[in-house]
Amino acid sequence: MEAPLRPAADILRRNPQQDYELVQRVGSGTYGDVYKARNVHTGELAAVKIIKLEPGDDFSLIQQEIFMVKECKHCNIVAYFGSYLSREKLWICMEYCGGGSLQDIYHVTGPLSELQIAYVCRETLQGLAYLHTKGKMHRDIKGANILLTDHGDVKLADFGVAAKITATIAKRKSFIGTPYWMAPEVAAVEKNGGYNQLCDIWAVGITAIELGELQPPMFDLHPMRALFLMSKSNFQPPKLKDKTKWSSTFHNFVKIALTKNPKKRPTAERLLTHTFVAQPGLSRALAVELLDKVNNPDNHAHYTEADDDDFEPHAIIRHTIRSTNRNARAERTASEINFDKLQFEPPLRKETEARDEMGLSSDPNFMLQWNPFVDGANTGKSTSKRAIPPPLPPKPRISSYPEDNFPDEEKASTIKHCPDSESRAPQILRRQSSPSCGPVAETSSIGNGDGISKLMSENTEGSAQAPQLPRKKDKRDFPKPAINGLPPTPKVLMGACFSKVFDGCPLKINCATSWIHPDTKDQYIIFGTEDGIYTLNLNELHEATMEQLFPRKCTWLYVINNTLMSLSEGKTFQLYSHNLIALFEHAKKPGLAAHIQTHRFPDRILPRKFALTTKIPDTKGCHKCCIVRNPYTGHKYLCGALQSGIVLLQWYEPMQKFMLIKHFDFPLPSPLNVFEMLVIPEQEYPMVCVAISKGTESNQVVQFETINLNSASSWFTEIGAGSQQLDSIHVTQLERDTVLVCLDKFVKIVNLQGKLKSSKKLASELSFDFRIESVVCLQDSVLAFWKHGMQGKSFKSDEVTQEISDETRVFRLLGSDRVVVLESRPTENPTAHSNLYILAGHENSY
């Protein structure tokens, strides 16, 4: 079927709605939305992909490919109906396949049967044999591109025009692609030269494994790591994991299709003679049965693949906890009264921090206006007057990666980090904690090379006069995003004070972080506790209530792109990924649906694409985590300490998840007091600091005992060999060559070689009269916490800027990731219910 009045091989330049009526959207991706449509002249259904074109797209290539694909007419290839160009949007009209893709199908049904896989492989090979005789390659065979019609016919999609357009438009996108179905010769094309249509045969073998195991081999690996492994000369073709579940014929078919040497790999016509796809009984009825399993699940047994952690006894837990005292005039402790008398600077936002939901100004002077470490900034105690820094502007929510993998609500909420520039260096984010103890303090700062390191360099002996501060812009140049939480405190010129947000919390809290809902703009504090993960909405403090989000013990939390990473315990500790927007949406459901805790079901009971919480593979037994963003490359890494090694993962934007890069087996120090990544110039992966020892060189106050994740051999040196181990409390990289180290009663600012940062006007070493338990870096001071209080000291004067001491209360810092969260309990009863506070009032905190 062709649209009326369509010139041969041309794209119609008129309104496509004269020929097609859009019925409903059936999918969306990076390059546009896909709609179910109806031809207004014939009533026949079609699939219409609408793509927004931009200047620079190679339109002549698109026209050429449309001409080529128009010639392809085969029962196993999705038919091309026509194209339209209207208002800078390209409409591509194709045959509609009502059954959907095999990927969507197996997410619901579980693995296909062996006969169903054989039928799909036969039909796929028939379509490929036709394409190959026409001198064409598909290049993207996988479950997501194999469709079923309502009658069980198998159709190859995303061939030709769609694939070529995708490749053309991808030039303007930061998208690597998914290499898991890629043949070795394609992965190594730059090294070994070209490839031919036999790469499609390899993809058929990988797809056969995908249909039987619900994912292709190496799917848990980061794509770049998978590409690297496939391009190596010693790469071994994958096999079906279960030797007993599948027949020897199926195993042999996969082995033949996955012949590593393309010269020995069979053609599509040759592979069609294999017993696996030539056996009798491979009819459309097999696909119809599969579709019935999707459409009528009650008539079929549920697929389950539970592991040891999936079902656990239901503990008696209060899923909703209300603050016991909401009376503002209630009796306050001595420390709470003093909280109101002290003001604090905003927390320092590190150059090495990447978490930035609300965005930063593109004004190159914006950083300097915040920076206390440039000459001309005010010094002195916290009560001195200082202009309130301009609020952060809202960041546009745009996506630069395929969205087909995400629910609609997740797509809408994705936030793209601003690109790196010379005027504002990239940032690193990090946080660390341990299951056995509360979290170590987190610092945060704005960094563009103008922070502590700039101050140190400008104030060294013999340095030139510091440059003048640029003109401060009017605050209206930086419109404040609307965030529903504790309001800023405009009368507090310095910033803010600690405010109580919850009375009488019965939970044993291990860690805390914060998150802003991208749609409602409500700000939440998220707590990791012995009884699970709980949230507190700061916009509803008048009826403060903590709601359980996840029922398992949690010792570490981190939020990235509306995804909550947690270290939670089932039978053992493991990393989890939680879709925050979907979890909050699920909690809103009325009646029984809201009480069905989907995370208690095995992963395979729920369709995988709709899973709200997923386990991170290869992280069982993880007991410590840290996250870092390399400011030189922009890559984000998560490192986990296992019982006998380290696992390194990298954040992959298109799939919005951390994926495995490397696994190292070796004994870690015990106890593991330090576990922090340090970014080193010109190194692809960070170094992992696992201990601190006394410096052995001249002027070296500390030595970082590190593991080099970049080396395949000799990457591990004996920790502490011939050196004195130090009992470090906290290590964090503030800037590229600036590390804060907390030891006993001292805070030291050192470089990556462990030497003090020299400065005439800044203290590179601060001492306190108590053993520090945790620290938070403020803009020009350090806030150190101890059992019965806290004390702030200025980097510039080494004077006490704030101090609270209350022997009747025991204090503990729960987290300082964007929002500083503090807990206190009565000294006489350390197991009593706790009060919770946040450092509130800074306009830039929300």
Curated annotation (Swiss-Prot):
Presence of the UniProt keyword Repeat in the record: no
Active-site residues, record numbering mapped to chain: D140
Binding locations of ATP: V26, G27, S28, G29, T30, Y31, G32, D33, V34, K49
Biased composition (Polar residues): 430-447, 456-466
Domain Protein kinase per the UniProt entry, residue ranges: 20-277
Cofactors that this protein relies on: Mg(2+)
Biased composition, class Basic and acidic residues, residue ranges: 328-358, 408-423
Phosphoserine found at: S335, S433
PANTHER family for this protein: MITOGEN-ACTIVATED PROTEIN KINASE KINASE KINASE KINASE 5, STERILE20-LIKE KINASE, ISOFORM B-RELATED
Complexes and interactors: Interacts with both SH3 domains of the adapter proteins CRK and CRKL.
Function: May play a role in the response to environmental stress. Appears to act upstream of the JUN N-terminal pathway.
Protein name (Swiss-Prot/TrEMBL): Mitogen-activated protein kinase kinase kinase kinase 5
Provenance organism: Homo sapiens (Human)
